[in-house]
């Protein structure tokens, strides 16, 4: 047997406040979704704006109501909706009688992205993301010897397409270079702290590289994917091997130098390492290049000789060229029957058409396919339409 949705709310059209127009305690409390110690009440207007659905939070422990910062563009007010609590701090909202580009939404209330935003903003935060069909783009792992130009290529990509790509900020125990900012280039971390976090299972991968510890925390990747951007990881070959073995379905690119002499020249010209460190990095480069070319980890190899040409090849490889649109992934809306019931069955949501003279269409939404997301962004949904008799 399936479970009924957490709740169904009727008549939430614009102008029909249904008890949610109030600043403090909403009157209609049975329409709240309980997650941990907090109830999330979805309805009425967002900060008096009649175009967007509002959210309020009740904390059971403090018995206080708050209006969170709402990230992303949320759904328009609607006739009614079903709300279903999903794992990992998300609420699925399925609207009634809405346009195909406004029918399925996710409210993030306790994801890593939300927790990070809460820390930053110092207040309650939630984020909306719209549900669309299709799969989110795979993260990109870029490896190559030190000084080959990985960081340069990634910076060019992020500068040209800031809304499309996001950088996974690694942790490292090495000291910051003079222009490097904590939390932007790396999370500069004490070795004992990082070792403890590795032990606590917080890292997707880690490795000792040129005498220091480097690692990608699960949260660093989630922060990017939850912001709806395609995640880029700049990691060494050992790290790439670990990611390949993990559940992260990524594409792997290895950047080769035109020659060892050119690699050495670039490292020296960068001027960020001591002579001893340069020698160490060059020694390691040999083994890295061999592993990169022969390990079977990398499906794509780039030669960074001429920077502009290499960048163009990288863009082509990522499906970005002068003819293709670059403002995010092309999205497909979801047409739902005007009148329907919603049932949850394991990781499937069944949306059954109701009403006289209808075709009794059933839409099956596969929750296991959901990834990426928020705020205001899309995530992949796989839908099947079944005709019941
Ligand atoms: N095609 C190129 N031609 C000449 N110089 C380049 C080219 N690509 C990058 N560089 C320069 O080489 C130096 C090293 O590049 P970058 O810092 O991007 O390397 P990296 O692979 O990220 O190194 P690391 O792994 O140590 O972080 C930089 O000074 C950069 O400006
Ligand atoms: N396995 C990992 N390797 C990483 C990570 N972050 C960076 N790196 C690699 O380290 C070297 C040196 O970087 P530098 O900033 O000190 O020059 C470079 O090859 C990076 O790709 C990581 O999280 N995991």
From Swiss-Prot:
GO BP: gametophyte development; regulation of developmental growth
EC number, as in UniProt: 2.7.4.8
Family: Belongs to the guanylate kinase family.
Keywords: ATP-binding, Kinase, Nucleotide-binding, Transferase
Catalytic function, reaction form: GMP + ATP = GDP + ADP
Gene3D superfamilies assigned: P-loop containing nucleotide triphosphate hydrolases
PANTHER family tied to this protein: GUANYLATE KINASE, GUANYLATE KINASE-RELATED
Signal peptide: none
Domain Guanylate kinase-like, chain residue ranges per copy: 137-319
Designated name of the protein: Guanylate kinase 2
Annotated organism of origin: Arabidopsis thaliana
Xref: SMART domains: GuKc (SM00072)
Domain of life of the organism encoding this protein: Eukaryota
Subunit structure: Monomer.
Known role: Essential for recycling GMP and indirectly, cGMP. Required for normal development of the gametophyte and embryo, in association with GK1.
Residues that, per the record, bind ATP: 144-151, 304-305
